[in-house]
Structures are given as structure tokens and as C-alpha cells.
């Protein structure tokens, strides 16, 4: 016999609202982080692609839940929220690594858009499933959704400064895995709770690994007609010696490859806006 769908009366509502809060938070963090990544890796005007990617993923998820998923029997809402949370945790690093491996080349932009739309699709699956299963508390769910989105819009600034664009995106996977733990507790499923905790550990390890090795570092498209790749192509021997993110851009410092007197290094903002760093002996005369 199929399992009976959990009634909102029997669900720990605080956990339910906390889960939706975290999922919505992760969605806004991801959307803003993508704008920064696309701007630095390809061109600044591709930053707005993030909005389209988010709308496609979220819109498709609503259609799927409305016309397909509701036909499933048993605790479909519980299972979908848990599996979708795991999927976000897995798919975010896969997407980053693909973009890293393909060197962010603009010819692969459609692929990057499809890959980044998948986490939004899964985020939408979670939120749509919750609204369908617990319509009686839709108002409070919506409030949790809005508060989470607001918090995400603020916290992403901190994540970008502390972990960079790639790190902030990996944080999305961590937040999603924590929501998976919450949804597993709602379902009172010990095995899935343990599995969700394993995903939390996995997400944390990826963040730490990236901080130590920059394994997910996304370069500027080497074929783009931007200041950074042009300078690297025209000056053999030059190399990026430091990369630092802030809340609105990525800064790359390049040294070597030039014999210009007094030129110590060049600084690039989002792969463009090249600026010289000139040596100075401190003598004002």
C-alpha cells in the first residue's frame, strides 16, 4: 500500500519553513554568483544571462510539478524535496568543473546555460512541491520563501568576498545539503538523514578543497577580445600571480612578459580594464 502523504498538521512547521528559507536563500546566492562568474569569465553583458537561466529552471520546475509530479503516489513531496536537495549539492560542482575544463569559452555558452539551469530547476521542484503538498500553510511558506531570498541577496556579498565567485557557488551546494537534512528530519527518515549529513560533509570538503587548490577556478575565456587574455597572448612569459574577488568583480594581477621600464605588473578587473602598476622609489622630486 502506498504511504500516506504527510499532512501539514503532522509536520514540524518550523522545520518546513526553515527548509524553504534555505532553499530560497541558495537560489538567490546562486543567481548573483552566476552574474559575477559570467562577467569575469566571458563578458559583463552575459551577466544578465543569469536571470534567464533562473527563470527557465524555475518555470520548468513549476510545470513539471503541476502536470506530472502530482500524479505520483505516496510521500512524493517528501522524497522530491530530499532528492532535489541532494541533486543541487551534486550538480553545482559538476557545472563549475565543466566550465573550468572548457576554459569558459563563449562557444560553449549554451551548454553553460543549460547546466546552470538545472540547480534552479531543482530549487523550483522543492518550492513547488512544498506549496502543492502544504497548500493550507501557503502564506507562511511564501513568507519563508521571500525572507530566504532577501537573506540570500545580502549574504551573497559576504560569500563573494570570503570565498570568491566559485566558492560562493559551492556554498549553494552546502546550503542545499543542509536543507536536505531538514527535509529528511521532516520525513522522519533516519537513513536519508544520515545520507543528507554525508552530502553536507561532501559540500564542506569541496569548499575547503577549492580554497586550497582552486580546482574549480574559472578562467577568463582565452579566446575573448578582452584585455587580460589579449595581454597574456601578446606577452609570452606573463602569468597571473594573484586573483582576488570582491562583492562586484574579480581582480587579476599579472606579472612578467614585458621589458617596459618601471612596469611592475598589470591589474585587470573582470578580465578587462587593464591598469599598469608602476614602480616608485619614493622620491617625490
Task: State where each predicted segment sits.
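Alpha-helical transmembrane segments of multi-pass membrane proteins
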Residues: 2-285
Amino acid at each position: 500500500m502506498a504511504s500516506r502523504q504527510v499532512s501539514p498538521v503532522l509536520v514540524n512547521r518550523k522545520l518546513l519553513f526553515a527548509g524553504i528559507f534555505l532553499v530560497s536563500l541558495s537560489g538567490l546566492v546562486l543567481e548573483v554568483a552566476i552574474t559575477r562568474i559570467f562577467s569575469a569569465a566571458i563578458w559583463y553583458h552575459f551577466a544578465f544571462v543569469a536571470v534567464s537561466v533562473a527563470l527557465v529552471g524555475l518555470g520548468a520546475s513549476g510545470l513539471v510539478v503541476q502536470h506530472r509530479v502530482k500524479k505520483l503516489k505516496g510521500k512524493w513531496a517528501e522524497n522530491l524535496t530530499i532528492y532535489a536537495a541532494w541533486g543541487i549539492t551534486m550538480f553545482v560542482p559538476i557545472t563549475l568543473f565543466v566550465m573550468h575544463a572548457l576554459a569558459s569559452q563563449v562557444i560553449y555558452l549554451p551548454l553553460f546555460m543549460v547546466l546552470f539551469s538545472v540547480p534552479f530547476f531543482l530549487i523550483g521542484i522543492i518550492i513547488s512541491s512544498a506549496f502543492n503538498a502544504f497548500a493550507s500553510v501557503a502564506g507562511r511558506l511564501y513568507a519563508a520563501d521571500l525572507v530566504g531570498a532577501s537573506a540570500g541577496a545580502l549574504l551573497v556579498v559576504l560569500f563573494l568576498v570570503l570565498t570568491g565567485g566559485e566558492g560562493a557557488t559551492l556554498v549553494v551546494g552546502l546550503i542545499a545539503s543542509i536543507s536536505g537534512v531538514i527535509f529528511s528530519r521532516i520525513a522522519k527518515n533516519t537513513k536519508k538523514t544520515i545520507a543528507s549529513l554525508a552530502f553536507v560533509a561532501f559540500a564542506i570538503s569541496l569548499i575547503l578543497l577549492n580554497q586550497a587548490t582552486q580546482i574549480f577556478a574559472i578562467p577568463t575565456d582565452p579566446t575573448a577580445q578582452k584585455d587580460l587574455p589579449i595581454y597574456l597572448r601578446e606577452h609570452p612569459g606573463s602569468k597571473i600571480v594573484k586573483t582576488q574577488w570582491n562583492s562586484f568583480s574579480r581582480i587579476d594581477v599579472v606579472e612578467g612578459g614585458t621589458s617596459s621600464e618601471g612596469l611592475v605588473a598589470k591589474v585587470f578587473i573582470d578580465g578587462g580594464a587593464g591598469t599598469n602598476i608602476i614602480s616608485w622609489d619614493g622620491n617625490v622630486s
